[in-house]
Amino acid sequence: MSSAIDITKTHIAYQWKYDRPLIACRIAPDGLQVASSSEDSTLQLWTVPGGEKKVLNGHESWVHALRYSTDGGQLVSGGCDGKIIWWSVRDESPSIVRKIDAHAGWIRDIAVSPDGNTLASVGNDKMVRLWSMSSGEKLCEMAGHERHIYSVLFHPDGSHVATGDLLGKIHIWDLSDRKLERTIDATPLYAENKGQSAEFGGVRAMALNVERNELIAGGTHKATNPFGAVHEPLVLRLNWSDGVLKKSHSCEGITGGLVWRVQWLVDGTAVGVSGGSTGGFLLFFNDSQEKEIHRFKLPSLARDMDIHQASNMVATAHHDNHIRISCMFAKE
């Protein structure tokens, strides 16, 4: 299921419904399976393209963080119960490989190192922790954030970890000495609403393009009424080396939206998924303009996405209980 990419021809190819609203999703490395999480605290494994479903029980709360191992043999999940679970997902009956107590409270994001040996996790306890993928042993923890940490990524060469928090601070950690090297300013993603006594926004998602030396960070701005879901999606384009803001990407007409995840396409196009009271959108950006170069309206509020580069396929997890698979090329 792959043709030449054309974002203007993006269309939904498959959709499968679960019993409860979905939260997160990831595509297996081979593109033949999609994992999702639901508000009933379970995980789901869906075959692609058939849509056959298996349900995994193990968490005691919602799961926002999902990652496959580099070989696709295991799925790792981080829950709001503070637990990280490794699952064998190629077995006829998928099972728990190990479960650890990882954080005090919500786990917001996890990432697997490029060599597949290390897992990074972050959450509401403001800690960055590294774990052995093979044993679950804690390798180290790093402190330095002042608020909840929402996002984490590894540099493709494995030398650094980046973590983004509620205040719009992106910390860059040097893994050679496991110390904070520098901080990138992404504070346009942070909002303080004194009338509602609320801090809102933050670096909800990040993606690094080494060839372009650019980091994109997604979230929201113009949060005039956070509790009323009035806030608009925003993506920042930052220089990785010095943190200079190169461009702010905003979207007209989406008055209730937040960018939950961002990724790069191989041609350098940045993609974000927005979900909120205005609905769900796939948003496409390049460096030529601040507004999106294309938007694809999804049928329902979206909470997460994952792109499979080899097949030009996008999975999205939706509040209307659906996992949807969209193709970024013309219908055949």
What do these predicted ranges mean?
Residues 1-332:
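WD40-repeat beta-propeller superdomains and closely related acidic/aromatic-rich repeat-like regions
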